[in-house]
Amino acid sequence: MSQYNGGKSYFSFQWHITDECDQRCKHCYIFSGEGCKELKSMTWNQMKEVVANCEDFCKVYNRIPYFYITGGDPILHPDFWKLMVLLKLKNIPFTLMGNPFHLDDEICRMLKACGCDKYQMSLDGMRETHDWFRKPGSFDLTIEKIGCLNRAGIKSVIMSTVSKTNMNEIPDIIDEVVKAKVKVFAFSRYVPTGGEVDTSMTPQEYRKLLEICDAKYKAYEKAGCETYFNKKDHLWTLYEYETGQFKLPENAEKGMIYGGCNCGNCHITISSNGDVMACRRVTDSKVANVFEDRLADVWICQMEKYRNYDRFEKCSKCELKAWCRGCPAVANGTSGNFYAPDPQCWKTRNEITGEELLMESSLTVSLENRAGLR
C-alpha cells in the first residue's frame, strides 16, 4: 500500500444531518436511481454521538476535525442551531453546504457567531439552466445571498457541477461570481446517476473547458479580483503538467501519494442514516455505520480497499499517479468500477517511460457489464 503524505493537520468529515431540502435537483445523488423513499434526519442524540465518534477518530490519528455539514439543506434540521452551539463550544471549525432560501443578514450573523467558516451554494448554469436544474428563482436568490454571507464575514463559496448539459455556461458563471464578489469558486464533474443530465462530455471537450477557464482565472487574478479559484478537479493537475505549470518534484519518494483524490486518505462521509461512505458520490462505497462502528477502526480496516493505488487500470501506469488519479467517483458512475479509467482523462502515454496508458478494452468491458450486455 502506498503511503499518504498530504501534510494536513485537518481531517474532513462530510456530514449529511438531514435529507430535507427545498429543491429536487436533477443531478442530486440523494434522489437519484429509485429515489429517496424516505427523508431521514438524525436525532439530537445521534448528532452528539457522531461528534464524539469523529473526535475519537481525530484523537487516535492526531488530526483536527473539520466538518462539512450538509443535507439536504442542513438549516432545515429541527436541531440545527443546537448543533451550531455544540460545535462552537467545542471550537470545531465547519463549513455549511446548503441552499440560499433561509439566509438573511441576521441568520448569517448568527452563523458567524457560531464559528461558521464558509457557506457553499451552487450555480449550475446561468439563470435559465440553473433554475431548470434546481427550481425557479434559485439563481437570483443565490446571487443575492452571496452579499449576506460576505457582510457577515463568512466566506461565500460557489460550486458548479459540470456536465455536457451546462459546460458551455461555466465561463459565464465565472464572470457572474466575480461580479458578485464570491470568495471561492470551484467546479467538479457530474457523476452519472441516470436522469436528464447529458453525460457525454468527451475528454477533449473537457480539456478545452479547462483551457478556457484557466485563461479566465489568470486574467481575473491579474486584475486583482477578490475570488479565489479552487482547481478542485484533479484533472487540473494533468492540464497544468502539460502546460508546464506543474512539475514533478525531483525529491518525490517512490510509492508515496502526495495529492489527488482524498477518498481513503483524509475524508469520510457520514449520511443522514449514519452510513459511513468512502465518498458520497460513489454510491456503493458504504463501509460502516457511525452508530455501530468506531471510525478509528473502520479507517484501518474497511477503508483500506480504497487505497490500493496499483489497482487503477490507467492511473497506475501514469507518472502523475501520486498527484492526480482523476475522479474515481466519475469513473465508478460511468463504468461501475472505482478503479476504471476516468472517462474525461485525455492522457494516453506515460511521458517518462513511453508506456501506453489507454485501456479501451477494459473500459469497454466495464461499460458493457454495466449495461447488461455481457
Kindly give the residue locations of the regions a language model identified:
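Conserved C-terminal portion of the radical SAM core fold
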Residues: 16, 54-69, 88-95, 116-120, ...
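Conserved radical SAM core fold
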Residues: 34-35, 74-76, 100-105, 118-136, ...
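Short, small/polar residue-rich loop motifs at catalytic or cofactor-binding pockets
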Residues: 261-265
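Radical SAM enzyme core and accessory elements
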Residues: 1-7, 255, 271-275, 279, ...
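Short glycine-enriched, charge-decorated loop/helix-capping segments at active-site entrances
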Residues: 34-41, 132-138, 199-203, 333
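Conserved alpha-helical substructure of the radical SAM core
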Residues: 1-117
